[in-house]
Amino acid sequence: LLHHKTDIIFAAFGFNESFAGKEKIPEFKSRLRKYITQTRTRAYNGKKGPKIILISPTPNQNLDNIPAADLNNERLAIFTSAMREVAESEEIGFVDVFSKPYPDGSTINGVHLNEEGYRAFGTALFKGIFNESPEPVNEELRLAVVEKNKQFFRRYRPLNTFYYTGGRKGRYGYLDFLPAMKNFEIMANNRDQSIWSIAKGKETKIKIDDSNVPELPETNQSRGGNKWMSAEDELKLFTIDPRFEVNCFASEEDFPDIACPIQIRWDSKGRLWVACSTTYPHVYPGQEPNDKIVILEDTNGDGKADKSTVWADDLHIPLSFEFGNGGVYVSEEPDFTFLKDTDGDGKADFRSRVLTGFGCEDSHHALHDFVWTPDGKLLFRDSIFLNSQIETPYGPIRVKNSGWFLFEPKTQRLQTFGSYPNTNPWGVTFDKWGHHVASHPIFASTFHATNPPYPTQHPRPSGIQAYSGTCGQEFVDWDTFPKEMQGGFVKVRYKPTNRVEF
């Protein structure tokens, strides 16, 4: 606020707070008054305190299997009235967007607005502030605002903040992460100038000049670079158990789209799906994410892929994915998204942001380990350094410094459990009794418990002590493995050496 010399603050409250119940109204009003008093005393623009306009929550809508309106609107109405009372007594602005009409189907989950819902919200907000109807939208102006917001969001809610403002800021990130943030600020300002030019009639089209954005400094590999080898030469260096054979199913040499693979998964047709990210560790100024999910097929049964299809190519660091509901659930920090091919052409053409607000302070610790539980819920987790705050129709979910999540697609209910400090979240599976076992590089332990009150955590678990980094595991129950290995456990190590162990 100080950096932007803020004159006016639009402050939206009431939705998350409402889940505390109407008995918390006195506390809510007291905290709201305290916020107003403190904010008024800060001259962010260097002259005087900002004007404050409170914005009520929007009404919830009932959807199939998600009775959000029935669950929440009575409480939301009470909290909206409380906000109006505080605004009147403090003599500040207030806009009631709760009691305004919204078309059916204005939300993605009964709670969060879609494009049509935001159009209705924008109209209600404009009328509430200026007491008149807005002019027809200038589409070019709207697109300019969207473009600015995209660049501003990358500065306001960036990935990997633990490396330039958090605990590792003195060791990593300061050479390129901080200059990148500065460049995003410059790019957002450049787009702001284009917005004003269109709004004032000086320009009719978006015209952006980024010539003032400096080049990022060159960086070095502090640990030294890897020695790149062909798949054939790499295979020659493998030490292989004599009971097994290993062949290269697909290589980047033959299929360039599978550069930087993160996760693989086989489908019911015997095709290998691969999530790849060249965007990692995050988007840099002037770039756009173009990560992929690629399908590899062996069409002639020779044990090698001979066909490659890019199923989705505009993803943002897809650390994990899982099939479901005729499509694919994907991790795209801070979002949890759903993709689907609706016309059968072999490429995703439908995309929905199911949930958002997941932590991204360390981008390779974000949502990972997607797997269906035996009772039909989608299980996943995040890891240390992250702070997740997710709004749902059933109330906010908060996790600090790692936690597990369970998601029910039918009702879109999200739960969290078993919060304890754990590191890189790479490896989860179920035994034949339905117990889930998870690994992480430092402790390689498993722990099950309901959550203590946020933000406290359980102590670190005592389990199988780790000996190195781990990045995958599975119980052996495949006929292709030797009989004496059935019922055993396979684990993958990634440091100090790459090994698959039994």
Feature roles, as predicted:
Residues S18-E23, N62-N65, P103-G105, S363:
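Extracytoplasmic/secreted cell-surface and envelope-processing proteins
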Residues R40-K51, I92:
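A short helix->loop->beta-strand "cap" motif at the edges of active sites that frequently abuts
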Residues L1-K29, N60, F152, Y156-Y163, ...:
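Oxyanion-hole/transition-state-stabilizing segment in secreted/luminal serine hydrolases
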Residues D210-F502:
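Beta-propeller domains with acidic blade repeats across secreted/periplasmic ectodomains
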Residues N60-V97:
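Substrate-gating cap/lid alpha-helix
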